[in-house]
Regions:
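Secreted/extracellular small peptides and ectodomain modules produced from precursors
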Residues: 12-15, 152
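Sec-dependent signal peptide recognition
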Residues: 2-11
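Compact, glycine-rich, soluble single-domain proteins
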Residues: 23-156
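N-terminal signal peptide c-region/cleavage motif recognized by signal peptidases
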Residues: 17-22
Length: 156
């Protein structure tokens, strides 16, 4: 009986592990800038990679550390840089969508605390297909312009 229970636990454990490792959509090199004391919003950057055989549509991003996370694109209108809200991000099979300064990004508003260099912002990304992934974005310096290359504890 004990051997049967052991085999059952191992079998279910392996099924769970296979589902976790079979994830074919990734959000990596996620980062954001440190927030000044008086700011309650921040742009989030990174790479959304689709290694699946079908199109994926990112439709919702949430964080326990913010009231709202929206998808935006920076646009230049009448000589001024502004942002427009986008409903979803389409990623073709084998393609990568880049979230970067002066381009497409996620905007977290209503932050529930100041984020300082080395902190992490936890994100949940949900897709039209029903897939959902978790990610962590590392907080860089106020002047950061790209993913911080040094290894930080929250990403380990």
């Amino acid at each position: 009986m004990a051997v049967l229970m052991f085999r059952t636990v191992i079998a279910f454990g392996c099924i769970f592990c296979a589902n976790v490792s079979a994830n074919d959509v990734y959000f990596d090199q996620a980062w954001l800038r440190e927030t000044p004391q008086e700011h309650s919003s921040v742009a989030i950057y990174g790479r959304l990679i689709n290694k699946s055989e079908g199109f994926e549509f990112l439709e919702l991003v949430t964080s326990e550390q913010a009231n709202l996370v929206m998808l935006h694109r920076s646009v230049k209108q009448q000589g001024m840089i502004g942002m427009v809200h986008i409903e979803s991000v389409q990623i073709a099979p084998g393609e990568t969508a880049y979230f970067e300064p002066a381009g497409m990004h996620m905007m977290a508003t209503g932050l529930r605390g100041r984020l300082v260099e080395g902190d992490c912002l936890k994100l949940s990304l949900q897709f039209r297909s029903g897939k959902a992934i978790k990610a962590r974005a590392i907080v860089g310096s106020v002047s950061q312009m790209e993913f911080p290359r040094k290894k930080e504890s929250c990403l380990e």
